[in-house]
From Swiss-Prot:
It comes from Cupriavidus pinatubonensis (strain JMP 134 / LMG 1197) (Cupriavidus necator (strain JMP 134)). Belongs to the D-alanine--D-alanine ligase family. This is D-alanine--D-alanine ligase. It catalyses: 2 D-alanine + ATP = D-alanyl-D-alanine + ADP + phosphate + H(+). Gene3D superfamilies: 3.40.50.20, ATP-grasp fold, A domain, ATP-grasp fold, B domain. Its cofactor is Mg(2+); Mn(2+). PANTHER family: D-ALANINE--D-ALANINE LIGASE, D-ALANINE--D-ALANINE LIGASE B. Residues 113-312 form the ATP-grasp domain. Signal peptide: none annotated. The keyword rRNA processing does not apply. GO terms for biological process: cell wall organization; peptidoglycan biosynthetic process; regulation of cell shape. ATP binds at residues 139-194. Mg(2+) 2 binds at residues 279, 281.
Length: 327
């Protein structure tokens, strides 16, 4: 595995590290929790690390901060969607995780699913919803239950499970309050799984799969972050063959999107054993309830060791020519 226990990383080699957290998305609260954990981990290893909140500090302050690299612990819009990545490209500051295009693609569930379908990767059938959509026709085509959610939000924010056609309008309006694009996808009845990933391209690898057992099968925002009632099984309890199949599917999905550094694929395992990709998170949570640190621990990698390796892999899409000058 490219990520290991006890990596030999000199904290001085990382230079001055900025941890971007908070931000302006609906996931701000979770980002603050993730970033605080990352910041503490880096500082505990002797890294010159500093927190930076783009919601309260300006671009000029970011440019003047003198960061040699940054750990992006932002979730959702303005941090996980390619916008912050593009800014850091302009500033020439290496950053963790996927680049501009992969981040933007993964943030948009519609674009992600279309790309996966093009590569014959299994993902639930879906339809885009608008105010003038014939919801009855969507239900007739996709069947019930349906999952209705904003195309560009995370942490289950704005998500509804529709079990009757009469619920479609309310579910649409809930999601549309957060995003102009709303997606309805076929509900997959089965086991909820997640698979963290590290590396890039040919070196991309999957960490152990985690099985999620939420109260009443409702893994919503509250049950993700603020209760202890949700069970996380790692080892997952899946057979070695099924776990390997889920990991291989997740790696393919990661590569197709062009992800790098680290990410987390959410997967549903249907009762007949067929896995379906739901979405790719390119800036996963790093809170006390988060899943990537749990999978890393199962692979023998501590939270601090994992963070050190993520930040050591910080890079840019484009590497500026230091000798270039405008004519």
């Amino acid at each position: 595995m490219s990520f290991v226990a006890n990596p030999k990383i000199d904290p001085k080699s990382l230079g001055k590290v900025g941890v971007l957290y908070g931000g302006r998305s609906a996931e701000r609260e979770i980002s603050l929790m993730s970033g605080s954990g990352v910041l503490a981990a880096l500082q505990s290893r002797g890294v010159d690390a500093h927190g930076f909140d783009p919601a309260t500090q300006s671009v000029a302050e970011l440019a003047a901060a003198g960061f040699d690299r940054v750990f992006i612990a932002l979730h959702g819009r303005y941090g996980e969607d390619g916008t912050m990545q593009g800014l850091l490209e302009q500033l020439g500051v290496p950053y963790t995780g996927s680049g501009v295009l992969a981040s933007a693609l993964a943030m948009d569930k519609q674009a992600t699913k279309r790309l996966w379908m093009t590569h014959d990767l299994s993902t639930p059938r879906f339809a885009m919803l608008y105010a003038d959509t014939d919801f009855d026709a969507v239900v007739a085509d996709l069947g019930l239950p349906l999952i209705v959610k904003p195309a560009r939000e995370g942490s289950s924010i704005g998500l509804s499970k529709v079990t009757d056609a009469s619920q479609m309008r309310e579910a649409f309006e809930k999601a549309a309050a957060l995003d102009n694009d709303v997606i309805a996808e076929t509900f997959i009845d089965g086991a909820e799984l997640t698979c963290p990933l590290v590396g890039e391209g040919a070196t991309a690898e999957a960490l152990p799969v985690i099985r999620i057992v939420a109260p009443d099968s409702n893994y919503d925002y509250q049950n993700k972050y603020f209760t202890d009632d949700t069970q996380y099984l790692c080892p997952s309890g899946l057979s070695a063959e099924v776990e390997r199949e889920v990991q291989q599917l997740a790696v393919q999905a990661y590569r197709v999107l062009g992800c790098r550094g680290w990410a987390r694929a959410d997967v549903m395992l249907r009762a007949d054993g067929k896995p379906f990709l739901l979405e790719m998170n390119t800036s996963p949570g790093m809170t006390g309830h988060s899943l990537v640190p749990m999978a890393a621990r199962a692979a023998g990698i501590s939270y601090e060791d994992f963070v050190m390796q993520v930040v050591a892999a910080a890079t840019l899409d484009l590497h500026p020519n230091e000798h270039w000058k405008p004519e």
